Amino acid sequence: GSEMCIRDRLYHSLLSPYLNVGLITADEVISAALKQFQKGKIPLSSCEGFIRQIIGWREYIHGIYWYFGEEYRHLNHFDSQRKLLPLFADSQKTSMVCVADAIKGIEKRSWVHHIPRLMVLSNLAMLADIKPSEFLSWMREVFIDAADWVMVPNVVGMSMHADGGKMSTKPYVAGGAYISRMSNYCSSCKYNPKERTGEKACPFT
């Protein structure tokens, strides 16, 4: 197993679709987590990590969305102009195991964990020089938790670094070695993360 290949819903609350559109509130979720901790049902580290995601990262993203305003979604720091690759619409159109697995997750559930979203899908879009607005539109269409206020900062600011560093200090870009180290995808892939050129060279490398 690995961080990227853990079973689909293990260790994940799957609350983001409900939180992001306001069907439940952050306060309700945090209160429920605290009650479970107080009853001794969950360890402190799990409770703290979960609450940090809710009142830390989630609220930061919400603030970024409103602080930078409507123009933020149109930023394109690297002037990337390529259209979305066909593989983003069909898991059968790539031999890259990590990418195919992430796309299959979308096809099956309209959801994948944030790590493959960032380090596989977004990483590929950035390395392939995809136009940020194209990638943002796709993310908004395919993910069940894709509220506008969530996706605009996550894609423009973090995934594509299209804001030139207003939100994050550096682009989240990684090569095949990172994916190999953090997952078990590469062992069954036709591409070799250690090769940069040739037919078996990993596109991420």
Predicted segments — roles?
Residues 12, 16, 21-205:
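C-terminal catalytic domain of photolyase/cryptochrome flavoproteins
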